[in-house]
Swiss-Prot record:
Localisation per UniProt entry: Cell membrane
Signal peptide residue numbers: 1-22
Family matches, as InterPro entries: Csa, Csa_sf
Topology class, membrane: Lipid-anchor
Protein name, as recorded: Uncharacterized lipoprotein SAOUHSC_00404
N-palmitoyl cysteine lipid modification positions: C23
Family: Belongs to the staphylococcal tandem lipoprotein family.
Length: 261
């Protein structure tokens, strides 16, 4: 009788071990699956890069959901901005935002120059200048006369990152960290890049980046992983980030319902 009980106990323990092991395995599979979903979600967005001629977006449709009206073709919103703060200096940023309306086939936005100044009381103040622009023949054109020749030239030569960025090597990047918060939901993926990376070389070619430190690439998103017109996906190349110095480049492209509908 005792031997039968021992055999029964052993069988019960064996079943318990198998069950626990299976549960752990399931959790791991779920975790790996979510990580892959995050990577695929970003890859799908980044697959649009590059679009050398922004006017191609007039004929390109993005992700649509219930937020769009039937007769609304949607509006693309693109933004690129370089921010630099050297030790003991103010944070300066230069960039542009453009709304490409597929209904009206027009594109308008602003070239933005911003300086963040800290006063003697430690309070920060934003000094921002916005220069209205439109896009014609894949070029940004000021809508008002500009006296500042430096800014005028910057606008003439400006390209959004989506026009030259390329993420065909994304699957070969080695990630430092992938995170997901289902309650918000927000998710991100971080990669350490090399200075030989194509996108890093392109940024250095276009901007005077005062460091030789290779950046980290941070991809940040919110909303449904499968797609959402109310969510976002942002790209950030962080060269330096601390209390005294900050050098980073941000970029984003969204497809939203049009305000004129």
């Amino acid at each position: 009788m005792k031997s039968i009980k021992r055999i029964g106990l052993c069988i019960s323990l064996l079943i318990l071990i198998i069950f626990v092991t299976s549960c752990d395995g399931d959790n791991k599979i779920i975790g790996d699956s979510k990580e892959e979903q995050i990577k695929k979600s970003f890859a799908k967005t980044l697959d649009i890069y590059p679009i050398k001629n922004l006017e191609d977006l007039y004929d390109k449709e993005g992700y649509r959901d219930g937020e769009f009206k039937k007769d609304d073709k949607g509006t693309w919103l693109i933004r690129s901005e370089m921010k630099i703060q050297l030790k003991g200096e103010n944070l300066e940023s230069r960039g542009a935002v453009l709304e490409i309306n597929r209904n009206t086939r027009t594109a308008k936005g602003h070239y933005i120059v911003r300086e963040v100044v800290e006063d003697s009381d430690g309070m920060t103040h934003n000094h921002t200048k916005r220069y209205p622009v439109k896009m014609e023949n894949n070029k940004m054109i000021p809508l008002k006369p500009i006296d500042d020749e430096k800014v005028k030239k910057e606008i003439e030569e400006f390209n959004f990152f989506v026009q030259y960025g390329n993420f065909k090597e994304l699957e070969n990047y080695k990630e430092d960290e992938v995170s997901y918060n289902p309650e918000v939901p927000i998710y991100s993926a971080k990669y350490q890049l090399k200075n030989s990376d194509y996108n890093v070389e392109q940024l250095r070619k276009r901007y005077n980046i005062p460091t030789q430190k290779a950046p980290k690439l941070l991809l940040k998103g919110s909303g449904n992983l499968k797609g959402s017109s109310v969510g976002y996906k942002n790209i950030e190349f962080t060269f330096i980030e601390n209390k005294e110095e900050n050098i980073y480049f941000t970029d984003s492209i969204y497809f939203n319902p049009s305000e004129d509908k």
